[in-house]
């Protein structure tokens, strides 16, 4: 994970945020649209990103339409929403929308 580890160094810059998307792209590929796709098959990139950036500087992206042919949109969504590294609740809400709203200025009028 050397390239990903180097990317985590960007977290030292306080004005940077990171988008988590396409996790099925970096995981072992399941058969197309298997409902039992396990997010645990993904390398520890989410854990590394949460440790480096924290939930308030991470945002989820669907990677749709490519995710539809890999892990499926539902699995991509639930994989992050319920990821153990986000401990549910506030952390997951930050990643699933609040960070993007802050970064892009949504609702700031």
Model-inferred region functions:
Residues 1-59, 70, 108:
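Catalytic pocket-lining loop regions of alpha/beta-barrel enzymes
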């Amino acid at each position: 994970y050397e390239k990903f580890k180097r990317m985590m160094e960007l977290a030292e810059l306080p004005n940077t945020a990171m988008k988590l998307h396409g996790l099925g792209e970096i995981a072992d590929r399941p058969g197309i649209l298997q409902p039992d796709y396990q997010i645990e098959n993904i390398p520890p990139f989410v854990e590394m990103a949460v440790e480096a950036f924290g939930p308030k500087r991470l945002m989820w992206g669907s990677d749709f339409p490519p995710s539809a042919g890999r892990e499926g949109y539902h699995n991509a969504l639930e994989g992050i929403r319920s990821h153990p590294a986000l401990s549910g609740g506030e952390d997951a809400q930050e990643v699933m929308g609040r960070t993007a709203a802050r970064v892009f200025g949504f609702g700031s009028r």
